[in-house]
């Protein structure tokens, strides 16, 4: 296979050089993680904010509002989000570029954050709603209602402070999922494009040399697996710390 650099592993290049380009693999791995984490972090924050708002409204007010929001949530959860993102990637990126909001890879990053958040918030909403339905029946909420506290005050003073623990836990468990999703879409050519670097692009390049230089693919894939696993373990530990009754 042509394009494989002759310089191997060394103190100067601990993970070697990228085939075809001769770039330092460790530097590209670290640099590419910035975009992957950027997409994952902003997607988690956006989806969580929308899900928190919808879940609180539906769980607290119930009735027709909850029924309408619940049907919308069920529809989006059943929707084939992956195929929709694949199908809309090119036309939507061109539309974003046409509006002047962002250009090139910035437009692709914005597209991924928007659509991953759009299809991601229903999962957060369902969890928050179930928590709100439980909290609103507790004595301190009933006491606040009996004292004439407004709905806004009850939501801000009684509900939100008791939702932070599950919110933090679900956010820590969701972030690695979006990190992996960004890698998958970049691998498929939907996300950020070369010469920029993300873990998905590194994996895509590595598959071309997997038979002659398997270490390139194994290091790229292993790095993603380790980071995702680390966040999942952190989320599990955080859940056990914030809610010891979860294992009972």
Regions found by a protein language model. Name each.
Residues 12-19, 42, 46-50, 59-60, ...:
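Generic hydrophobic transmembrane alpha-helix motif, especially the helices
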Residues 23-38, 42, 62-70, 133-137, ...:
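Amphipathic cytosolic juxtamembrane alpha-helices at the membrane-cytosol interface
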Residues 1-48, 52, 56-57, 78, ...:
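Gly/Trp-centered helix-boundary motif
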Residues 62-63, 77, 81, 94, ...:
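Short, conserved catalytic or interaction motifs in soluble domains
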Residues 52, 56, 60, 64-71, ...:
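Membrane-spanning helices that line or support transport/gating and their immediate boundary helices
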Residues 56-60, 90-94, 130, 134, ...:
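Transmembrane helix-loop junction
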Residues 88-92, 104, 116, 173-223, ...:
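Glycine-rich helix-loop "coupling/hinge" segments at transmembrane-helix boundaries
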Residues 117, 121, 125, 174, ...:
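Alpha-helical transmembrane segments
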């Amino acid at each position: 296979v042509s394009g494989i650099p002759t310089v191997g592993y060394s103190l100067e290049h601990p993970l070697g050089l990228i085939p075809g380009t001769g770039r330092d693999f460790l530097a590209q791995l670290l640099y590419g993680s910035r975009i992957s984490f950027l997409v994952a972090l902003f997607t988690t924050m956006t989806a969580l904010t929308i899900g928190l708002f919808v879940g609180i409204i539906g769980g607290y007010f119930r009735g027709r509002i909850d029924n309408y929001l619940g049907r919308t949530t069920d529809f989006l959860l059943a929707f084939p989000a992956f195929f929709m993102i694949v199908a809309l990637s090119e036309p939507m990126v061109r539309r974003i570029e046409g509006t002047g909001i962002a250009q090139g890879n910035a437009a692709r990053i914005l597209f991924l954050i928007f659509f991953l958040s759009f299809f991601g918030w229903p999962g957060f909403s369902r969890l928050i709603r179930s928590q709100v339905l439980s909290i609103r029946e507790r004595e301190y909420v009933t006491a606040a209602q009996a004292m004439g506290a407004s709905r806004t005050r009850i939501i801000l003073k009684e509900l939100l402070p008791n939702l932070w623990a599950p919110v933090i836990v679900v956010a820590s468990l969701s972030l690695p999922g979006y990190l992996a999703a960004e890698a998958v879409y970049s691998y498929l050519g939907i996300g950020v494009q070369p010469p920029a670097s993300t873990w998905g692009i590194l994996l895509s390049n590595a598959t071309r040399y997997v038979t002659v230089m398997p270490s390139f693919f194994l290091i790229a894939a292993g790095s993603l697996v380790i980071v995702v696993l680390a966040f999942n373990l952190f989320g599990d530990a955080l859940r056990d710390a914030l809610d010891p009754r979860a294992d009972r």
